[in-house]
UniProtKB/Swiss-Prot annotation:
Belongs to the astroviridae polyprotein 1AB family. This is Non-structural polyprotein 1AB. The modification O-(5'-phospho-RNA)-tyrosine is found at Y693. CDD domains: ps-ssRNAv_Astroviridae_RdRp. Cleaved by the viral and host proteases. The protease is probably autocatalytically cleaved. It comes from Human astrovirus-4 (HAstV-4). The lineage of its organism: Viruses, Riboviria, Orthornavirae, Pisuviricota, Stelpaviricetes. The record marks Q175, S176, Q419, S420, Q664, K665, Q755, A756, Q912, G913 as: Cleavage. Residues 800-813 have a biased composition (Polar residues).
Length: 1415
């Protein structure tokens, strides 16, 4: 490259010449040598930009220019690079639209070339495979042994000749001897001649007189058939006479005998059958029955035919009894063999009985032979002629089908006559817009789409699982991204920029489904069809035959407005799913609290309606789950049943529509609320997560959860009907609430936006016994003055414990004040300033979705501050929060702390600066020299002291006055448990969890066993392959937790910290670590308040919990949250049960899974100090296994971040409440982000090691092994157990891993019954029984936390009743809970809680409803 000439990297780059030529002239060989890896033979854009715009500076170099290159990289991304004098540095991409379009086409061309190359390679490989298979076929044909010609044995020829001779002699017949010689009876011959002459004379007379009758003609035909005109001594008469005499049997038998000897595979049996058939006299009738026989039944038939020769009555009796005896005595056979034997016996019975009847009546069995032969021929007639003929073209494609049946001309005539009636109307024209259609192309196939708004709409099944699809429009191909797929079979695709000027289809505001038009592309041709439609809930049906490529086509009315999206065809009717404006935007799922409140109101409305009208029923539509799996016969059957069910539903709706004018409607009645589809009922969710389940064992369920549970039960009571009668369908049902029949709505009374409220109010508790009269709530008019607002506030009850109100039509929370109370308060200048965050704290989503509304609100705030008039703020903030909630964003009122309810938190001193408590290693600047050792044991280092104000003593044992309502217990086993209390000695004792025995270097000592354990772990968790690292702002964790030191000095919870500073510190610290810094994280240690044995409390044996800085925890969530979520989704098939629910048959399903393995041994394993004694080498190894599942690119990119994260897990700087700082280097910390998941993987890895230790690395035997784990809980089934298993396995874990298993904690049985898992013992029906009911009773009578009210106590008792569902009826714990419920129910008659759960409700919760029943 000559100096001063523009530089071009390739010919396309020179042809396009994007950017500045001056910048190209500045390129030097050094700059060219260090160019980034752009796509080969692709253009780049060169810019000549002022240096100060790229590198901020105030010096003289600000106006110097630098070269910026923009292009496409080999990894498929788009980037810009600036040369800083030494190397190219990546900067924020500069958009060049022409370059981006060119790169897109180049990428597509390269992809197509790669696909072509791979296809050609695959074609060549397949062609080579075909040649190999052809050669192999020829070679194998040569190896096939050729059948040798059968050798005829002389003995069978002799036997056949003897049997044939015996059968042909006159004595071979079972009849008396008769002289059948010809010309011996001369008198009869003469008499016959005279009669013949007389008949001929009479016939000639009649012919002469022309007096021939029909009877004479029939006699003539009969004489011809009887050879009357053939001379008596003619050879033809002699041949036919002898053939008739022998009935062709002897000749046929002789031929069969020769053929049997020559070709039969069992000549002896066949010859004996011929002989017995001749001996018995059945002859030809035997032959058609032989194919029905097996070898056994054939010998039975031969025996009975021989018996018939001697005693026919005995043979008939045995033949009739043979099928009956065979049905009884041959039942041990398999089905196919059993049916064959019975069929042969029945054929024998028919032959013997029928043959005897024929011989008795006619003297021959010819009629029986004809009947059997006719039946067989009719049975085989379907083989000769098919049901239809298929006409194919040269390529083998079927172009036409012709039925083989003969058309009924008369039927077709009347059908056409009926259809071609007199024209009674004129068809209307319809509007179509072909320019609004496009073709959606995916690797799985093609579909039709249409432009509407800013999206391309099509069917979801046409898109499949693809994130990007190709949009074909007017011969051009565009790549587009799938934006959103709702629950319906609809997909919304982002419209490419080049296609925005195209025509658009609008949605119909007033749908008319009487006549619909379907437009679609089929084989690049536009097809249009018009038909009448029927509405079935959210779908349409119409008589249109669906062709390939029509999925996703618009279904429009006569004005060209979209009604629905064409979906499918089930044989006779086309189907479409109705589309409405709400489908275009994803709706944020309501929170758990909102769902609970909504369902409480629905339940109460349903109960009120049921009380007024007992016939009212609530129908819950079943949830249809589509899974991608292999298709089996049962799947095909289910698919056909679903299609037929849909067709019958369509037919039923059409018939009901025809009969509607003739049906009478009862006056004075309305069916609103009966059987209506409850669209807002919660569907298919687990009753309890693992966190709630753990809490349930200690504290029970609260009132909200229990009411939600009751609502679920009532919603599932009518689980069997699957249809929706149109009598119960209400088109005006908007899903906001359900009320009784006679409730009249006043739509102007109160405006309630509960569905989109940003800050849900808590549930109300039990109202006062005598509530004071309340003023009627009026709607809030935001245009009124401040005085009227104050007057309105006086009308609305603002108590933190509101009085009980009657449920309103649009209210979702029982007795809840209107949502306006959250916004209608005395606004001041501080409220106005802090309602909106600073512009730099707004997220990208806020700016895109709410940009205009935020600007509007800022203007209103500025005006309000200037005029000191804040009356317009409530409405403006409410509208902003409403728009935010509809877009799935958090409301702004929720983002700030309410002045009335917020806690005054201490802020950081001004002279410290933000860095002192934002950074992960801020604690180091506050570290002081060590002081007195108080809570740190002597074998742990004392690194220093930090200023902290936390207690190290806790001797509180709460006394709950509500427990005075409960009866005195007679069972005192619970007294050995109690709430934990501690002093400094408990902190020292808690460090003992890390010590039991020293592990060896098992990776070096047992490499083969470790390799087997690794193989088993990778095989078990293979579904984690290609998991991803997520952004820190997308992580989820409990924000109501301590933010650790030093943030805990200024904020009580992480939620307070987030509200004060947002995500900026999190992103800053993550970037800091990503750039290479390795700050040392500080963990905060505290003891757990729980119910344990009194002996442990006296010994100060309390569990310690450590928690790290929330920024560090969320960095761990970035690395492992995706894997943790997948583990929770695979509890049914994987070993880890984190996320598992024992409710709705979950417990029994898991136990049945272990039983179905068919192993003889079941093992319950209980560890001691499990997570504290995990060897650091093993813990680090498990973390490496998990990291190997991460996507390769991200695995390399964030490798150093992961190493830093694991290093801070293994080497923990720990702060105690006494201010002492120490170092922990053992175990799995109980407060890290993935404690349970890591414990699960360690548990499984150690089991695989243990299996190989006792059985060797046998991979095939390991596949019969199965286990379920939850942290340190373990229940497994194994095909073999060595002798002295308990002693040997305890020694193995102690000597190799240094882990502690106490004697008696390893239980091995030949049945799973009696073993326990997660606090439940398995009973005979594989159902759960609480393992330690005395501990549950202690948490009731000796709690570590006081319950807030009597409703919470009653809810806790209901929870214990649920846990004791499968306990013995006379168990003291179950009896005591029932006694307590009777006490508390008397005090809570108006609370809305049930007095107790019925047996049916308990079984529904544990086993599931009629659609989910598992046991």
């Amino acid at each position: 490259m000559a100096h001063g000439e523009p530089y071009y990297s390739s010919k396309p780059d020179k042809d396009f010449n994007f950017g500045s030529t001056m910048a190209r002239r500045q390129m030097t060989p050094t700059m060219v040598a260090k160019l980034p890896n752009f796509v080969r033979n692709s253009p780049q854009a060169y810019d000549w930009i002022v240096r100060g715009l790229i590198f901020p500076t105030t010096g003289k170099t600000y106006f110097q220019r630098v070269v910026v290159i923009t292009g496409g990289l080999e990894d498929g991304t788009y980037g810009s690079f600036v040369f800083d004098g030494r190397e190219w540095v990546e900067i924020y991409p500069i958009e060049h639209l022409n370059l981006m379009s060119s790169l897109k086409l180049i990428h597509k061309a390269n992809a197509l070339q790669e696909r072509l190359r791979l296809s050609q390679e695959e074609k060549a490989t397949l062609a080579l495979d075909v040649q190999f298979l052809q050669h192999e076929n020829v070679r194998l044909k040569e190896l096939i042994p050729k059948p040798e010609p059968r050798k005829i044995q002389m003995k069978w020829i002799i036997v056949g000749a003897v049997l044939t001779f015996l059968s042909l002699i006159p004595g071979g017949y079972a009849q008396s001897q008769i002289n059948n010689t010809i010309f011996t009876d001369m008198i009869a011959a003469c008499k016959y001649s005279t009669e013949t002459l007389t008949e001929n004379l009479d016939l000639r007379i009649k012919l002469a007189l022309a007096n021939i009758t029909i009877s004479d003609k029939l006699d003539a035909v009969r004489q011809i058939l009887n050879f009357a005109f053939v001379p008596r001594a003619h050879w033809l008469r002699t041949v036919f006479y002898y053939i008739h005499y022998y009935e062709m049997w002897n000749i046929f038998m002789f031929v069969l005998a020769i053929g049997t000897v020559m070709r039969s595979a069992r000549p002896g049996t066949d010859l004996i059958t011929l002989a017995t058939s001749h001996l018995s006299g059945f002859r030809m009738a035997v032959l058609p029955t032989i194919p029905f026989h097996t070898t056994m039944t054939l010998w039975v038939m031969n025996t009975l035919m021989v018996c018939y020769y001697f005693d026919n009555l005995l043979a008939i009796t045995l033949a009739i009894l043979a099928p009956i005896l065979g049905i009884i005595f041959l039942c041990f056979m398999e089905d196919s063999n059993y049916v064959s034997q019975i069929r042969g016996l029945i054929a024998t019975a028919v032959l013997i009985a029928g043959g005897h009847a024929c011989l008795t009546l006619t003297g021959t069995t010819t009629s029986l032979f004809v009947v059997i032969l006719t039946c067989r021929f009719i049975r085989m007639a379907t083989v000769f002629i098919g049901t239809r003929f298929e006409i194919r073209d040269a390529n083998g494609k079927v172009v036409a089908t012709v039925p083989t049946r003969i058309k009924n001309v008369a039927f077709d005539f009347f059908q056409k006559l009926k259809q071609s009636g007199v024209r009674v109307g004129v068809n209307e024209f319809v509007v179509i817009k072909p320019g609004a259609l496009c073709v959606i192309d995916t690797p799985e196939g093609k579909g039709t789409g249409f432009f509407s708004g800013n999206d391309i709409v099509t069917a979801a099944h046409a898109v499949g699982n693809n994130t990007f699809v190709n949009v074909c429009y007017e011969g051009l191909m565009y790549e587009a991204k799938v934006r959103y797929m709702p629950e319906k079979d609809i997909a919304f695709i982002t419209c490419p920029g080049d296609l925005h000027p195209t025509a658009r289809l609008k949605l119909s505001k007033n749908p008319d489904y009487s006549c619909v038009t379907v437009m679609a592309y089929v084989n690049e041709d536009l097809v249009v069809s018009t038909a009448a439609a029927m509405v079935h809930g959210n779908t349409l049906s119409y008589a249109v035959r669906t062709q390939d490529g029509m999925s996703g086509a618009p279904v429009c009315d006569k004005y060209g407005r979209v009604l629905a999206v064409h979906q499918t065809n089930t044989g006779y009717t086309g189907g479409a799913v109705i589309i409405d404006p709400t489908d275009f935007h994803p709706v944020k799922a309501p929170s758990r609290v909102e769902l609970l409140k909504e369902e409480i109101e629905r339940l109460k409305a349903q109960l009120n309606s049921a009380a007024e009208n007992p016939a009212t029923a609530v129908t819950q539509q079943p949830v249809v789950t589509l899974e991608q799996k292999s298709v089996s016969d049962s799947d095909v059957v289910d698919l056909v049943r679903t299609a037929m069910e849909r067709e019958m539903k369509v037919l039923r709706d059409e018939i009901n529509g025809i009969l509607a004018p003739f049906l009478q409607k009862k006056k004075g009645k309305t069916k609103h609320g009966r059987g209506r589809v409850r669209r807002n009922l919660r569907k298919g969710v687990k009753l309890l997560t693992e966190e709630e389940y753990r809490e349930l064992l200690e504290k029970g369920l609260d009132r909200e959860t229990f009411l939600d549970l009751i609502d679920r039960i009532i919603g599932e009571r009518s689980g069997y009907p699957d249809y929706d009668d149109e009598d119960y369908y209400d088109e005006d049902d908007d899903g906001w609430g359900v009320v009784g029949d006679d409730v009249e709505f006043d739509y102007t009374e109160v405006i309630n936006f509960d569905q989109a409220k940003p800050t849900p109010a808590p549930r109300t508790v039990k109202p006062k016994t005598c509530p004071e009269p309340e003023a009627e709530t009026q709607p809030l008019d935001l245009s009124q003055k401040k005085e009227k607002q104050l007057e309105h506030e006086q009308q609305v009850v603002k108590s933190t414990k509101p009085q009980k109100n009657e449920p309103q039509p649009y209210s979702q929370t029982y007795g809840k004040a209107p949502i306006w109370e959250s916004y209608d308060f005395d606004w001041d200048e501080d409220d106005a300033k802090f309602i909106l965050p600073a512009p730099h704290r707004l997220t990208k989503a806020d700016e895109i979705v709410l940009g205009s509304k935020i600007v509007k609100l800022r203007t209103i705030i500025e005006t309000a501050i200037k005029t000191q008039n804040y009356s317009a703020l409530p409405e403006a903030v409410f509208e902003l929060d409403k728009a935010a909630y509809e877009a799935g964003l958090e409301g702004f009122l929720q983002r700030v702390k309410s002045k009335k309810g917020s806690k005054k938190l201490q802020r950081a001193p001004e002279d410290q600066g933000a860095q002192n408590y934002h950074s992960l290693d801020a604690w180091k600047s506050l570290l002081e020299p060590p002081r007195e050792r108080r809570c740190v044991p002597a074998n742990f280092p004392l690194l220093g002291h930090l200023p902290i104000n936390r207690p190290i003593f806790d001797d509180k044992k709460p006394r709950d006055d509500l427990l005075g309502l409960l009866p005195e217990p007679t069972w005192h086993a619970f007294e050995e448990y109690g709430p934990t209390t501690w002093g400094p000695q408990a902190f020292i004792k808690s460090f003992d969890k890390f010590f039991y025995a020293e592990p060896i270097d098992f990776f070096s000592e047992y490499p083969q066993l470790c390799a087997f354990a690794d193989w088993a772990t990778y095989r078990e968790f293979r579904y984690l392959e290609d998991t991803r690292v997520i952004h820190i702002t997308a992580t989820e964790k409990n924000t109501d937790s301590t933010p650790a030191y030093p943030k805990m000095n200024y904020f009580d919870t992480e939620e307070n910290y987030l509200e004060a500073h947002g995500w900026a510190p999190y992103i800053r610290e993550f970037t800091r670590v990503f750039k290479g810094d390795k700050p040392e994280v500080l963990w905060y240690l505290f003891l757990k308040k729980e119910i344990i044995k009194e002996e442990k409390i006296r010994n100060s044996d309390i569990r310690q919990i450590v928690c790290a800085d929330p920024i560090y925890t969320r960095i761990g969530a970035c690395l492992e949250a995706h894997q943790n979520a997948l583990m929770k989704q695979h509890t049914d098939t994987s070993v880890g049960q984190c996320g598992w629910s024992p409710m709705e048959g979950g417990f029994k399903k898991t136990m049945q899974r272990l039983v179905n393995k068919g192993n003889k041994h079941f093992i319950e394993f209980d560890w001691t100090r499990y997570d504290g004694t995990i060897p650091p080498a093993l813990f680090k190894h498990i973390k490496e296994i998990r990291w190997n599942f991460i996507n390769k690119d991200q695995r390399e990119k964030y490798k150093h971040v992961h190493e830093w994260y694991v290093d801070n897990l293994l080497n923990r700087h720990v702060l105690l409440p006494s201010g002492e700082v120490t170092l922990q280097t053992r175990g799995n910390p109980s407060g890290q982000f993935s404690t349970t998941m890591d414990n699960n993987m360690v548990n499984f890895w150690s089991q695989a090691f243990e299996f190989a230790y006792f059985n060797g690395p046998d991979k095939d035997l390991w596949k019969t092994y199965d286990t379920v784990v939850y942290g340190d809980d373990r229940l497994s089934t194994t095909p073999s157990v060595p002798d002295d298993y308990e002693e040997r396995v305890i020694n193995m874990y102690r000597d190799i891993f240094g882990m502690w298993v106490k004697p008696g904690k390893v239980i091995c049985r030949d049945s799973i019954v009696g073993l326990s898992f997660c606090g439940f013992t398995v009973n005979e029906n594989l159902e759960p029984v609480p393992t330690s009911p005395e501990k549950l009773m202690a948490s009731l009578l000796k709690p570590y936390k006081i319950l807030p009210d009597l409703e919470s106590l009653h809810g806790k008792l209901l929870c214990y009743q649920l846990l004791a569902a499968f306990m013995a009826e006379d168990h003291p714990f179950k009896v005591y809970v029932e006694h307590c419920l009777s006490r508390t129910a008397k005090q809570l008659r108006d609370s809305g809680l049930p007095a107790r759960l019925t047996e049916e409700q308990l079984h529904r919760i544990w086993r599931g409803g009629p659609k989910k029943c598992d046991g």
